Design a protein with these regions (language model features):
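Short, acidic/polar
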Residues: 26-40, 114-126, 209-222
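Active-site-proximal loop/turn and secondary-structure-junction residues that shape catalytic pockets
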Residues: 51-55, 106-110, 139, 202-204, ...
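Glycoside hydrolase catalytic-domain groove-lining segments
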Residues: 69-106, 114-202, 248
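Aromatic-rich peripheral "rim/lid" segments of glycoside hydrolase catalytic domains that contact
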Residues: 208-252
Length: 252
């Protein structure tokens, strides 16, 4: 089920030495579903799916997808984005009976890019199948020069506000199109502005993020018309000062 090296058939690993499941493996899909159901059975209140994508770093010239290869390489109308869209639809169909929200983490630039970033993630392909979408709009993860900002870490408000404002526009446009073309689609009720719930940066990579920088991202989220967000720090040390007097400023 693993992604393989094209050169010798061994397990392919990224720069961190981590192996990857082939996103096109239906057996892997069933394995993920089984873990999700077991998580529900033991009492978790939400299922959040992360790393639901194709690899993005490592020796990409020596990579082979045993289950996705034919679809990814031989059919220009299929590709990585369609493989993942099919996976998202499968998750939804297999977990729709669970009385709990299902959410998905996407790269931050899925809110501003219309292509799949070569990892298979397209915002509109995920919207019909999850209760919440969490773009990881960490300012430090944007490339130098993004939207004209040479030092992205110096503009946490601007990066987050622009990214999430674009996502809000896209979800409204997507819902309008789908409502006119497939008015009876069951997923239309999922398509709402506050389906968007971004991950914001509260860590010190690659520079220390001050309370002001963290709060700027929170304010940027509210100003984009959203009312929920999450903070990320791998060390689980969060900036208390940034959270003082935080209220829901938008109830759309």
């Amino acid at each position: 089920k693993a992604v393989k090296r094209a050169s010798d058939g061994a397990v392919w690993r990224d720069r961190k030495g981590i192996g990857w499941l082939d996103a096109g493996s239906h057996e892997a899909w069933d394995y993920v579903v089984s873990i999700a159901r077991e998580s529900y059975n033991v009492g978790f209140e939400e299922l959040n799916f992360d790393y639901i994508r194709f690899p993005s770093d490592g020796n990409m010239r020596d990579i082979y997808y045993p289950f996705s290869e034919e679809k990814v390489l031989t059919d220009p109308d299929f590709g990585k984005a369609k493989v993942l869209k099919n996976f998202f639809a499968y998750l939804d169909s297999q977990l729709e009976d669970l009385d709990m929200p299902i959410s998905a983490d996407l790269f931050g630039m899925t809110t501003t890019n219309k292509d799949d970033l070569n990892i298979g993630q397209v915002l509109e392909n995920a919207l019909p199948y999850f209760d919440y979408i969490a773009p990881m709009v960490y300012p430090s993860h944007y490339p130098t020069g993004f939207n004209g900002y040479q030092n992205v870490n110096a503009y946490p408000y601007e990066i987050v506000n622009f990214s999430m404002s674009e996502a809000v526009k896209r979800i409204r446009e997507f819902k309008e199109i789908k409502a006119s073309t497939t008015p009876n689609a069951p997923y239309l009720s999922k398509l709402r502005t506050n389906q968007l719930r971004p991950w914001l940066q509260d860590n010190d990579y690659p520079v220390p993020y001050t309370p002001e920088m963290v709060r700027a991202q929170i304010d940027a989220t509210y100003d984009a018309g959203l009312n929920s967000w999450m903070l990320w720090d791998a060390a689980n040390t969060y900036t208390r000062a940034a959270l003082e007097n935080v209220t829901l400023e938008n109830q759309e």
